[in-house]
Amino acid sequence: MSDYIVVKCGGSMLNQLNDVFFDCIKKLQQKYKVVIVHGGGPEIDAKLKDCNINVEKRDGLRITPKEVMDVVQMVLCGSTNKKLVMNLQKHNLLAVGCSGCDGNLLQVQPVSEEIGYVGEVSYVETALLKGLINMGYIPVIAPIGVNGNEIYNINADNAAAGIAATLGAKELIFITDVDGILHEGNLVKETDESEIATFIETGVITGGMIPKVQAALASLKMGVQKISIVNGTKDFTEVTGECIGTTVTKGVSIA
C-alpha cells in the first residue's frame, strides 16, 4: 500500500471550506502525499444559466454538447481550480492547479454519443502528479480529460477514483457536509458493499448520500482499498492523521 492520499472535494463544498479543512490537509500532508480533485457543479450550472444554456443530466452525468463543454472547461480549469489553489496557499499549503488535459494527465473513453463530451478515466499519467509532489506541491486537479484531440468532462468522483486506483492510494477521502453514513442517528464507522446495499433498500441511506456511497463502491471496484466519507466542515483527522467518518471497504461489516 502506498503513502498517497486522494481527497475529492465536490463543487457544492468548495464555498463551505473553512480553516478546519485546511488544517486537516496540513495534518494529512505531514504523513502522506496528497492529491486533491475537485468538482464544480453549482458554478457550472450558474454560468450555463448566464449563457442561456439549458442544464441537462442523465443518470447523474451532465449532458455535454460542445457549447456546454466550453463552459465546463472554462469554469473547472479557470475560476474553480484557481480559487481552491489560492485558498490552499493562503493557508501556507503550496499547490499547483492543473486539469486532466495538462500533460495528458487523464485519458478517457467516451461514455456515449448521447451525452456528448463525457468520458470515464481509462489511463492516468502519474509522472506529472509524482513530479509535483516530489517538488513539494499539492496537485489540485480539475476533472477534464482527453481522448485523441478532444477534451471531455469527467465526473469528479470517477476522476478521483481513477487517480487513487492508479496511484495505489492508501485512501480516497470524499469531503461532504455530513459526518458520514448515519444509522438511527449514530455514525456508522465501518461498512462494506453488501451492507450499503441493505442500507439503501431499508432507507438508512437516502437522498444525496446515495450517489456518494455509489461513488465509493465504484472506487473500490477500480482498485481503491479504502474509502472515507467525512465532514469537511469539521476536524476529520485524529491526532494520528487517520480519518474520522465512515470507512467503506470491500469486506468489512459492523459487529
Curated annotation (Swiss-Prot):
Give the enzyme class: transferase
One family from Pfam that matches here is AA_kinase
Compartment(s): Cytoplasm
Stated EC number for the protein is 2.7.2.8
The protein's UniProt keywords, in alphabetical order, are: Amino-acid biosynthesis, Arginine biosynthesis, ATP-binding, Cytoplasm, Kinase, Nucleotide-binding, Transferase
Give a short account of what the protein does: Catalyzes the ATP-dependent phosphorylation of N-acetyl-L-glutamate.
**Similarity field:** Belongs to the acetylglutamate kinase family. ArgB subfamily.
Q: What is this protein called?
A: Acetylglutamate kinase
Record organism: Bacillus cereus (strain B4264)
